[in-house]
């Protein structure tokens, strides 16, 4: 979502996301991924229209805080449930929290929902340093928690704010080595 969304009506926001999605379909993208959303009511009509137009896979990912709520007050459980019960092809959570809090949230949710689940936490929590938001480098701790997240059943794992190509490379290496074993 864009910061200017706050000044638009629901119908205006839906209309803009439909235009963006249709443009992506017309360009021939393989997947349309709406990420870091605090609510699903904006996306549901967008997804319906896009799926009726072409069968481009659509992923939706929500941003929640360490308590499991979006900045619009929706719980992670409610957001994921709404998306699972729609035409969305893949659901998930990204941003908002570091890997520890993401893992704690996922332990309270049933992510075995019949659709692929994507989980991409931030590298941690940024600190304001010299007029910039900076994330501490903690790849080992991040990878350790990502392994636990994958073991809970996440189908797609990665990183959001504060991660970089080296984090993703280390996730890939961890998967290749077989360090990730899904829970039974």
Region roles according to the model:
Residues 1-184:
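Domain-level signal for soluble alpha/beta catalytic cores
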